[in-house]
Amino acid sequence: MSEGAPAAKRARAGRAGNPIEVGYWKIKGLGQPIRLLLVWAGFEWKDTLYECVQKNDGTYDKSSWFDVKHKLGLDFPNLPYLVDGDLKITQTNAILQHLADRAGLSGTTEEERAKVNMLFGLSGDVRRRYTGAAYSPKFDEMRPGLVESIEQKLAELDQFLGSREYLVGQGVTVSDLLWYDLIDQFLVLDPTILDQRCPNLRAFHSRFHNDPKIVAYRESDRFITQLNNTQAFFK
């Protein structure tokens, strides 16, 4: 599979020759597709991880982030953030698009780039419903409807993918990594979520999950397994 993505074979440093820095909570969340893109494209990078800690009184301490939030030189302080040389940016999609542009994973034509952006938007819609439920005290009550809703969207994506290897074009784009990560998280939510209506996505997920670069990352110490933050009801 890697041969379909020549950009992944070139090691890349940050814009100033230093490793790219990703700042985010010590969870998958919005940070994981960024990490996967860095791994796939062969960037040198490092995690700066912030932790949400539950205190004895049941409240949550996020001071590891809030103590430094306005001291990092970010125009719009938020997590995740990316430091690439002298460039400091926030907002997940902006970060992904910047890295994809650098790595040649944004699509090769105007039509492909439009479809990549469409898949960004679709992923945001699905993720918002998933995250809203995961952090709700009514998660157990919401779970069946959430799974049904996600399964419907995945069935549409399965039809869009068809028998192709990649979601857009003839090679890997950032949209593939974005959706691989989401599907991987949804399989924790419900291991059967692809079984009835998504045979193409099952094969799609397996190809990325078993790619040597992804396997090496999953088996490394830097791989994070927690999906959502400590105060979530589905972690």
Language-model-detected regions and their locations in the chain:
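Hydrophobic/aromatic-lined pockets within catalytic cores
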Residues: A100, G104, G124, G162, ...
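Short acidic/histidine-centered micro-motifs embedded in hydrophobic/aromatic stretches
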Residues: L119-L122, A133, Y180, S220-I224
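GST superfamily/GST-like fold recognition
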Residues: V116, L167-F208, R218
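Short alpha-helical linear motifs
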Residues: S136-M142, R202-A203, D221-N229
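GST-like domain detector, emphasizing the conserved glutathione-binding G-site
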Residues: S2-L154, D158, E165
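C-terminal helix/juxtamembrane-tail motif
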Residues: G4, I214-K235
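Surface-exposed helix-capping loop/turn segments at secondary-structure junctions
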Residues: L105, Q159-Q170, P212-R218
